Amino acid sequence: FQDDPGEGMQAYIFKRFYWWEKECKETMEKTFGMKLIYSSWKEVNERAAQIDEKAALDEFCSWNLPCDPAVTDEQKTLIGQLYLAICEVIEKLGGVDGIGANCLNETMYCKTTPCTIWNALFEKYGIVWCCEGDTLTLLSTYILYHSLEAPVQMTNIYPFLVGQAAIYHERIDSFPKVDDPENYALGVHCGYAGFAPRKFCGEKWKVMPKVLAIVNEKATMVDCELPVGDMVLAKINPSFDKITVIPGKIEKFVQFPNTDSLNATLLHYKNGEKLMEDLPSHHQMIIVGKQKAKIAQIAKVFGWNYEVIE
């Protein structure tokens, strides 16, 4: 769902992403035999506003999601309305396997945020998701989740080597103190560790009030935590002929009160300088477990070049 990629609330940040380019869409469709369909984010939100409020609240409540006490019935209703409007589009199209929205930069069209909706669509229909309309991550999530069936999360990666740029962006005072900071990163997206479905996080999953100033005051986000332990970062490269894998660990979760990073994943890996050179995107997928060898086999099936940073 998008209308004007590159324009909107923070065009100076979002002006150009490769996944918005016509070349990206056409290459993706040709390479993988899939179809990428754009639908209006503005129109689906206008339709959401027309949906009966009681029906929308009942729909949300039927999901039995853990919610912070600060999340109001009005916020739940807005989520339910948008969910039902999106379901109308899905039913009309048919055969939808993945979904996303340009939700941050075009937040002016929306009174809520779609994070909780992605959870419902995944739980009910197995539809995978991406944040910010990142179709490269959507494709990566679809292929790798359905191949590995391991818990996966999309997030922003902030290597400590990025320095002040990351600290400023998340409004934190400093990175956590560690012995080898060149080999650490924070995983943060929209105020928390990033979105993952409830089934991947157990009890460490809750609907929370929004954090970022860019979104509507009635918006929400999910505070969730993947299991601590082995993980890989992985994503298909924009060339669509290569996949980059970074083995490491989810070491713990760290909190920064009164910032844009209330709960972040602390990621530890090897060869941080190489990661800075070759990481294909700041949007990364965290996949739980020791998945390096399995992804190598997936790469053979798809004919991808396979790069491991370790």
What positions do the PLM features span?
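Aromatic/acidic polysaccharide-binding cleft in carbohydrate-active enzymes
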Residues: Y109-T112, M154-E170, V178-D179
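C-terminal functional extensions of proteins
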Residues: L84-C87, L138-G163, D278-F302, V308
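Short, highly charged low-complexity linear segments
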Residues: P159-I167, K199-K210
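Conserved anion/nucleotide-ligand pocket segment
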Residues: F1-F17, A166-P197
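Extended hydrophobic packing segments that form well-structured cores
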Residues: G202-E310
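Conserved, well-structured core segments that form the ligand-binding/active-site neighborhood
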Residues: F1-A150, M154, Y158
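Short, surface-exposed linear patches
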Residues: M28, D58-C61, A120-K124, F175-D179, ...
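The substrate-binding groove and active-site-proximal loops of carbohydrate-active enzymes
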Residues: E74, A196, C201
